[in-house]
């Protein structure tokens, strides 16, 4: 497997990096508070950390849902967090023209699951030279991810991460088939597990996505035990009042406990997997 290096963070090595933060940038102060707390926890546990938050939630269920403050304001906040806490940052893009602007700030460009087959978007992200993290679509077989990887490689980029976030099962349900982790790893790149979006129930509510937060630990520990190379998790300090994905963001006051368990499961996998 190709190891993907990001400063002093290595995806595909023995340590299991953590990508986390609030689903959407709600405000500068809120993001700073979350970044500070996660930095404290991950430093204590010696877990490599990449801060994540979105400047625009472009695929909200309802047109009236909060989307964020937009590209310019969002990138300014992400840049401040990056410099203030000396941590790498990531965000997602939705249009090819976002790629160059975002690449001036972030260390990883994330491609949303719904857009994972959009060739122009993949090419634009790849051509920045940044690490590109593609979230596998809910509609996509893990075997088809090889086509996504080919698009990125043919665009000159081999700094690739793939994120598993479950597959649509019937109406309004997601199921994670953990065979997808080694299947996608077989294409040569690290695979991240999205612990929070995998717990979603799309369309569970009329105007917003629901979810089963209580199953996040079970699925996460199973994914780590299946060899996941990193964990993606959206976290919040007031989950019930979060402005996006309130049903599945993980409470920040429970983050240290779940990360401690992740470390233990990772050690067991490395020793016996």
Model regions and ranges:
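N-terminal small/glycine-rich loop or linker at the start of catalytic domains
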Residues: 7-24, 54-64, 190-205
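Alpha-helix-loop-beta-strand connector modules within alpha/beta enzyme cores
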Residues: 36-40, 44-45, 64-90, 125-131, ...
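Glycine-rich, proline-tolerant flexible connector loops at the mouths of alpha/beta enzymes
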Residues: 22-31, 49-71, 236-246
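Catalytic beta/alpha-barrel core
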Residues: 69-70, 84-98, 107-120, 131-142, ...
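Catalytic alpha/beta core domains of metabolic enzymes, predominantly
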Residues: 129, 133-235
